[in-house]
């Protein structure tokens, strides 16, 4: 039986990692073998753990290239969990397809759009393959409504790939994005 792909996406501070960690916990409670991965580029909260903004976490294999995942996935692995997929190369798409064909469920979490509202290529590819998409929202940093679907960069230049947290990025709704973008 083929595996299923679940992609959890949305802006920063929307609970993507928290949701990913809840699926890890479900698989562990079901005594299913899991493999958890994060990109080496993201060491914001911990170098060897996936950690949510709220502080919850789980140990993860830290890799640079998607192909490295294969050496950590054993015959009896039932679930693969990948955080911050936007930081991986598009080669992740082929690795995930292979895992699904092997009957392994895959859960991915990551940003769908850059702070300039351009799609992250790897996330977009995974969304095209997904069996289930969980689109998260956040509380808008400006108006306080639970309608933020965008991430606005407020410090640190214009680079689209620039790892950071609250010192660089805020979650905003489209109206507030357009208002604030005129000022930034």
From Swiss-Prot:
**For this UniProt entry, which segments traverse the membrane?**
none
Q: How does it assemble?
A: Homotetramer.
Quote the subcellular location field of this record. Answer: Cytoplasm
Lineage summary: Bacteria, Thermotogati, Thermotogota, Thermotogae, Thermotogales
Reactions performed catalytically: thymidine + ATP = dTMP + ADP + H(+)
**Family of this protein:** Belongs to the thymidine kinase family.
Instruction: Using the UniProt record, give the first listed, main subcellular location.
Output: cytoplasm
Q: Name one Pfam family in it.
A: TK
Organism of this sequence: Thermotoga sp. (strain RQ2)
What is the protein name given in its UniProt record?
Thymidine kinase
Q: Which UniProt keywords apply?
A: ATP-binding, Cytoplasm, DNA synthesis, Kinase, Metal-binding, Nucleotide-binding, Transferase, Zinc
Q: Which gene encodes it?
A: tdk
């Amino acid at each position: 039986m083929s595996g299923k792909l679940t992609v959890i996406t949305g802006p920063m501070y929307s609970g993507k990692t928290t949701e990913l960690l809840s699926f890890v916990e479900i698989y562990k409670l079901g005594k299913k073998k899991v493999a958890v991965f994060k990109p080496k580029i993201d060491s914001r909260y911990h170098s060897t753990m996936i950690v949510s903004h709220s502080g919850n976490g789980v140990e993860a294999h830290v890799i640079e290239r998607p192909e490295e995942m294969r050496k950590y996935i054993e015959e009896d692995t039932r679930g693969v969990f990948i955080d911050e997929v936007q930081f991986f190369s598009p080669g992740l798409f082929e690795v995930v397809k292979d895992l699904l064909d092997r009957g392994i469920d895959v859960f991915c979490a990551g940003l769908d759009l850059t702070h300039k509202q351009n799609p992250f290529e790897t996330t977009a590819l995974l969304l095209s393959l997904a069996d289930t998409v969980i689109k998260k929202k956040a509380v808008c940093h400006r108006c306080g409504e639970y309608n933020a679907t965008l991430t606005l960069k407020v410090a640190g230049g214009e680079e689209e790939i620039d790892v950071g947290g609250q010192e660089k990025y805020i979650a905003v709704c489209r109206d507030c994005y357009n208002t604030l973008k005129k000022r930034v």
